[in-house]
């Protein structure tokens, strides 16, 4: 599904955000990417989403390598939900936010309407279609931001701190929504209870390196969590 091999990312100022990192995401896997602030989680997601180009190493999804020539094709297979929902909600109405990517691809408006309606229904937010994001709660914004990504039919979903800005009720709705989505997921999070509810694999990152990779039992080790600032 998604294979990362010997990935390294060094920023212009010399910061080594990702350091020779390798792992694979399987078809039925939901990975919680955990680590203290500055560990490299967001940098990794940005590289996997094709937003920034790694210094070296390789990324492959469904047999397709991330190269400049194929980058647009690759990006269609990766859905990236940013930490701040407002980064993906900038149109007058939620309907237009969700339709935005489809329109950029030149899809027929009738087809777009069907896709938007089905996507919003899948997340139980059809009632938000004709509303502005400026009038939505944090939880509603989060669901709408996910819808903008789902409408593009990605193969893999990436999330950067999806529970940020959410109250307990909104978190419960998010857990239910993510568990209903069959897409493999990589979720960067500091929210351990949330991780146990939506993920079946844990990767601990520190200084851009994978320190631990295993099942949910990793989250029961107080010594491990303390060691890596979690």
Model-derived features: positions:
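H-loop/switch region of ABC-family ATPase nucleotide-binding domains
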Residues: 189-190
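Conserved beta-strand-loop-alpha-helix hinge in the C-terminal portion
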Residues: 209-230
């Amino acid at each position: 599904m998604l294979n990362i091999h010997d990935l390294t990312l060094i920023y212009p100022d010399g910061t080594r955000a990702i350091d020779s990192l390798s792992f694979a995401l399987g078809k039925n896997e939901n990975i919680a990417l955990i680590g203290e602030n500055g560990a490299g989680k967001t940098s990794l997601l940005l590289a996997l989403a094709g937003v920034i180009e790694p210094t070296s190493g390789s990324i492959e999804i469904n047999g397709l390598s991330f190269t400049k020539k194929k980058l647009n094709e690759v990006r269609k297979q990766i859905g990236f939900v940013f930490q701040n929902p407002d980064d993906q909600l900038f149109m007058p109405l939620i309907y237009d936010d969700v339709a935005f990517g489809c329109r950029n691809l030149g899809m027929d408006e009738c087809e777009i309407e069907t896709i938007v309606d089905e996507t919003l229904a899948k997340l139980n937010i059809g009632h938000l279609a004709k509303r502005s994001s400026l009038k939505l709660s944090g939880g509603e914004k989060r669901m709408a931001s996910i819808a903008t990504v789902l409408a593009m039919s990605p193969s893999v979903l990436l999330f950067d701190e999806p529970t940020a800005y959410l109250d307990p009720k909104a978190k419960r709705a998010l857990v239910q929504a993510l568990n209903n989505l069959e897409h493999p997921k990589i979720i960067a999070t500091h929210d351990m209870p949330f991780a146990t509810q939506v993920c079946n694999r844990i990767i601990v990152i520190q200084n851009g390196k994978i320190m631990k990779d295993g099942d949910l039992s990793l989250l029961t080790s107080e010594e491990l969590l303390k060691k890596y600032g979690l």
